């Protein structure tokens, strides 16, 4: 933070990932973000900038913290995506995982291939960027460990009706974000 109360983040769309990097994350099958994914990631970042004192600039490094985006096709059982907080946690910083976010792209999970406004791929981008901003899930659960369900929620309002960081549908709290057959998410 530069004393102005605004966090200036930089980001990069990865063009490659070493085998060591992939092993560190427990994933396989790197691929670059498509132009569609890049555009939707920028819009998801703008969603955060609209409600928080944070800016995002695409460049190789710099800013208060740095984020990266990449795709993977295997590993991280149960996770459609995952991300790490940039630069503030020694565990992540020394391991080289800080600020990284990864999105599952394969034949059995296609939501991240064509993210767009009002679909789960776009919601996933917004959610994972939230993790890089330091936000956690409203409850103690994680798709990478076990098979969490709404029964694991710590409080009744732990749904996407109240937080983009929740795993659980707004239907669990008698809300409905479906308009004309389309889910209206971040």
Q: How would you describe each model-predicted region?
A:
Residues 1-33, 83:
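Disordered inhibitory propeptide/activation segment of secreted metzincin zinc metalloprotease zymogens
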Residues 1-6, 36-161, 166-176:
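Metzincin-family zinc-dependent endopeptidase catalytic domain
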Residues 27, 145-146, 180-181:
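Generic preference for flexible, low-structure residues
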Residues 31-38, 183-186:
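Ser/Thr-centered flexible coil motifs
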Residues 174-186:
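Short, intrinsically disordered, charge-balanced linker/junction segments flanking boundaries
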């Amino acid at each position: 933070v530069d004393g102005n109360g605004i966090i200036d983040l930089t980001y990069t769309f990865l063009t490659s990932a070493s085998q060591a990097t992939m092993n560190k994350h427990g994933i396989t099958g790197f691929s670059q973000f498509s132009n569609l994914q890049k555009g939707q990631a920028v819009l998801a970042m703008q969603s955060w900038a609209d409600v928080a004192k944070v800016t995002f600039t695409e460049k190789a490094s710099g800013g208060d913290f740095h984020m990266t985006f990449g795709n993977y096709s295997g590993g991280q059982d149960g996770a459609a995506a995952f991300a790490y907080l940039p630069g503030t946690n020694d565990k992540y910083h020394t391991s080289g995982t800080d600020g990284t976010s990864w999105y599952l792209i394969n034949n059995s999970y296609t939501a991240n291939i064509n993210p767009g406004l009002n679909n789960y791929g776009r919601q996933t981008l917004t959610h994972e960027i939230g993790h890089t901003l330091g936000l956690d899930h409203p409850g103690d659960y994680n798709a990478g460990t076990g098979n969490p369900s709404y029964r694991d929620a710590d409080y009744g309002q732990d749904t996407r009706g109240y937080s983009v960081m929740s795993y659980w549908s707004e239907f669990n709290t008698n809300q409905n974000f479906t308009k004309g057959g389309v889910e209206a998410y971040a």
